[in-house]
């Protein structure tokens, strides 16, 4: 594909990718939309690679959100590997978005990550759904799938990383975090959070 410097700049603005990556994607793609898809795929792979590295995530910040009426508050610890990233606007904006998500999501999340859920809780949840009369009416072949679907649906409400972002229902919080991981090149971990609601 033939492209101009304006095309490279536009692609950088849309994807947040580096100059060389944008130039390479435009060279390899037949259309502008295809270049965007190439960069998104590359970014997702990079985020997965960064997550799999065994670097300590002991830097970061603790941030809060208090609703203007004073009846709702959130405290969040968000970690990364270096203080350089912890001071970056992308990281601070992510922390802000996460506190707003925790405050505004209904139902409110209980766990930060799937790995935070105790095995006993999952076993209890599975037993509850298996005992459901609606599930028992289903043919034997599909019951396990129905139970797994119900568990997945409940976890998409109870686990912050699985929730749909309140500002864009096309992406999950996990994808939002992955996007910042891709931009910063560092693993980011939601360590813990607490949500306080007056009278709850």
Labelled PLM ranges:
Residues 1-200:
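N-terminal assembly/interaction segments in proteins that build large macromolecular machines
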